[in-house]
Every structure is written in structure tokens, then in C-alpha cells.
Amino acid sequence: MKRSEINNIICENKRLCNEARFYLPIWADWTPEDWAAKGKECAEIKDNCLGWDITDFGSGDFAKVGLSLFTMRNGNPALDHKPYCEKIMMIRDGQIT
């Protein structure tokens, strides 16, 4: 998938979340420059692989076969004792996941 397509899908999903009054954490909107300015205070976000996952499952056609998800919390047995995760998954009408 091209980065521009991924960025468009993320924008679409942010709009969907806002319309549903499902509020993502502030770091969901950080730019690459914002991330570069952050230090170890954001290690948990990186260590636990939080954030956006956009996939077409290798199909090359996200519109037909794909899934978007945002991970807000994720357990990491190597670093902490959280035994759970919290994710929101988004699919389009007719999309196969």
C-alpha cells in the first residue's frame, strides 16, 4: 500500500471515530515531527505497538479486502502485567476481513 493511501484511510477513520464520539488519544494525531520531539515518556506507546494498523492482507486491494484498527492499550508481559488490550477495528461496507 502507498503511504498516501494509508494516510487517507487514517483520516477517514478519524472522521468516523469523531462522528461516533469515540475519542482517540491525543497521540493519534501526532506528526512524524511530534514523535521525533518526544522522549522516553512515550516509550510505552512504542514498546507496546500502540497506534494505527492498516492492512490489505497482501491483496493489493484495500477497498475489497482490508482492515483498519487502532490499538489504545496492549499488554506486554515482558515489561508489565497488563493482561489485556483495547482496540477499535473499522471496516468498510462490503469489505472482507
Where are these regions (language model features)?
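Short, conserved beta-strand element in jelly-roll/cupin
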Residues: 83-84, 88-95
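A short, N-terminal "cap"/entry segment at the start of jelly-roll beta-barrel domains
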Residues: 1-84
